[in-house]
Amino acid sequence: MSSFIKRFRKSTLVAFNRTVHFLQDDYSVWSYEIDADKESVPFEKGRPRKYFDADSDSDEEQQNGDEPGTGKNNGGGDTGKKDQDDQTNAIVALDVNEDRSLVAVATGDKSLYLFEVDQDGRTLKVLSRRLLSRASSCVKFAAGGRFAIVCDKGGDCYKYDCEEYRKPGRWLLGHMSQVLDVLIDTEEKLIITSDRDEKIRVTCHPDCHNIETFCLGHTEFVSHLEFLGPELLLSLSGDKTLRWWNYTSGKELARKELELPGNKLALQKLAADGTGLLAVLCYKPTAVNVFKLSGTTGCEFVQALNLKSGQVFSTIAFDESGNLLGFVIEESTGAPSLAKYEFDRENFKLAKEAAFIKSFDDSKLPYVDSVSFLFKKKFDNIKDYQERKRKRIEENNKQLG
């Protein structure tokens, strides 16, 4: 089960299960629960097209329009398995675009929802619900909010129009393994994707058949990407490294060794001189390591933020004030809560210890290890083969003797 924290103007967006929560400055919360059975949801039946017909706007002629997980065309489903459906249809990917007040949410039932936040900042309006070919692994808006890119667990990336939001998606590019993160440069000329097979790929847009370069060097899955400046990219990997790249040339500029494999990172809004805080959530997420970014390709360790026994971090993010927010789960009960760590912006030190600013008492989010399966699996078939060969030779020798 996934959870997400995003900055949205003066609010903090927290999403998990099937609910999106907006936390205001005064810690008041308004929530929106995604319900596929709501009649007001504009449901689009056309699924995205792939390579051979990517220029087509719709594929409704070839699709039956069955809603995922129901086998029906009317959007209805069996309500007798609500608890199971809540888990199956939970939020699996999310992104926000402040310029156009948009929120994109992908759910486990292979749906992509596009929401608009009303001017009062307290209401979500459903613009569309579109079908995905596979379960999503990540979603990202372009800087201007004209479109969003959705990547799935099969390695394919699709482009979804946010202006003509009734259109199905169009296939852009594909990897040979699961895509874990995606970025779009501010000019919308390059798409950067990272995958489970240790690769970072820089692809031209909209001519995605042209690959600009690869950023190669990681030896495990690349879980997170962040822009640090023009042509400067930061990557986090399961090989226990942070790496800085010139993403137009594919050249590695610097690296930072970590004690544990990297899972997620959060980047504080950088100052004009490029300084700021970087928080890294590693595998076995009982602590967050905080670093100070110095210059364009360096960082120094500040401190580790540790939780009590029996608690784990699910995700992290910095708010508008530069404070670190951590979504914390009690392993024994699945009770989620939001913790805030306040930092001094001048010396980058922790100013206040963790304060749990919001508890979601009516919700449960069991902690699930979503990282261990990403590591490479090594199989030593030679020893098994040699053992079988030895036994076969011994049996043959006995028969001949």
UniProtKB/Swiss-Prot annotation:
WD repeat positions: 86-125, 174-213, 217-255
UniProt KW keywords: Nucleus, Repeat, tRNA processing, WD repeat
Span list, region Disordered: 45-85
GO-annotated cellular components: cytosol; nucleus; tRNA methyltransferase complex
InterPro entries recorded: Trm82, WD40/YVTN_repeat-like_dom_sf, WD40_repeat_dom_sf, WD40_rpt
Gene Ontology terms describing biological process: tRNA (guanine-N7)-methylation
SUPFAM superfamilies documented for this protein: WD40 repeat-like
Pathway where it operates: tRNA modification; N(7)-methylguanine-tRNA biosynthesis
Biased segments, Acidic residues type: 54-64
UniProt function note: Required for the formation of N(7)-methylguanine at position 46 (m7G46) in tRNA. In the complex, it is required to stabilize and induce conformational changes of the catalytic subunit.
Oligomeric and partner information: Forms a heterodimer with the catalytic subunit.
Name by which UniProt lists this protein: tRNA (guanine-N(7)-)-methyltransferase non-catalytic subunit wuho
Native organism: Culex quinquefasciatus (Southern house mosquito)
